[in-house]
């Protein structure tokens, strides 16, 4: 059986934490920021985590992470 391949796009977007969760950045932070409140932009800077519902799908994309 051939080696499993890592999905390179996903590998660049996610990092694994010490406890095994997947860390991610929030979307909607690159442009059209004038209409977004300071509070919303500040919260978007914080770390997001992959939901437990998506963990199985992410494991397929990132078998060696």
Swiss-Prot record:
What PROSITE patterns does this protein map onto?
A: RIBOSOMAL_L35
> Sorted alphabetically, which Pfam families does this protein's record hold?
Ribosomal_L35p
List the residue ranges of the region (Disordered): 1-23
Which branch of life, at top level? Bacteria
Which keywords does this chain's UniProt record carry?
A: Ribonucleoprotein, Ribosomal protein
Q: GO terms for biological process?
A: translation
Please give one Gene Ontology molecular function term for this protein.
structural constituent of ribosome
PANTHER family the record matches: 54S RIBOSOMAL PROTEIN BL35M, LARGE RIBOSOMAL SUBUNIT PROTEIN BL35M
Q: Which HAMAP family match?
A: Ribosomal_bL35 (MF_00514)
The UniProt family comment states: Belongs to the bacterial ribosomal protein bL35 family.
> By what name is this protein known?
Large ribosomal subunit protein bL35
Q: Which gene encodes it?
A: rpmI
